[in-house]
Amino acid sequence: MIARLTTLLAALIAVSPAAVGAQQSTYPPIDRYLMPRDAEIALARTAAPPSITEHATIKLLTRSGYVVAHQGDNGSVCMVMRGFTAPTYTPAMFRDLVYDPTVHAPICFTAPAAKVVLPYYELRTTLAMEGKSPDQIAAGVQAAYAAGTLPHRDGVSMAYMWSAHQHLGPGIGAWRPHVMLFAPNYDNAMLGGNPFGSPMPQVTDDAGTPFAVIVVPVDPALAVHLPAGH
């Protein structure tokens, strides 16, 4: 297990900057990011355990952004993030994932995160679909947060990313199921400095900012698979 994780970490460090940097710097046609409706609903439902997804709202990506395909009743929202929705803006080596239409990152925001965090990801998507560059998206998000048009983050909230079918980027693939803790202003030193890609909790996104994300890997046996026939 340790050897496998070490190999994965080496791949993340060695492959990701080159592979991501090699991505084109213009957006492919939006149709390359879109999925068939039923396939996207099924994939979104693999983001979390059925106890969450069976009662969650499901959103799908369309040419006009994310729209509700199924209205739930537990406050959670599940969807499939794309390259222009999912990547962090620090470390900067991942910014060009916005141009990669192969990224599929199923996620289920729990009710508090759906209220406070989801609008941030939807804004990033909107800005990308308007043709904004990664730097322009980052600036737009920061401006919206400063202006109060994005919800202020006062506490920690959570999302599931348990899909066995996620593709998080070149050299990363499905990695392993994990939860995302949206923890404003955390940095990795506060968690013990655990290395990127390790099985320990780590701050992977936007450390020291209101948008900081802690990734907590979970048992790979918990990965949620598509039902037969999909």
Segments (PLM) and residue ranges:
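Bacterial N-terminal signal peptides
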Residues: 6-17
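Positively charged n-region of N-terminal signal peptides that target proteins for export
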Residues: 1-4
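Primary mode marks residue(s) on the alpha4-beta5-alpha5 output face of response regulator receiver
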Residues: 24-230
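Boundary at the C-terminal end of the N-terminal hydrophobic targeting segment
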Residues: 18-24
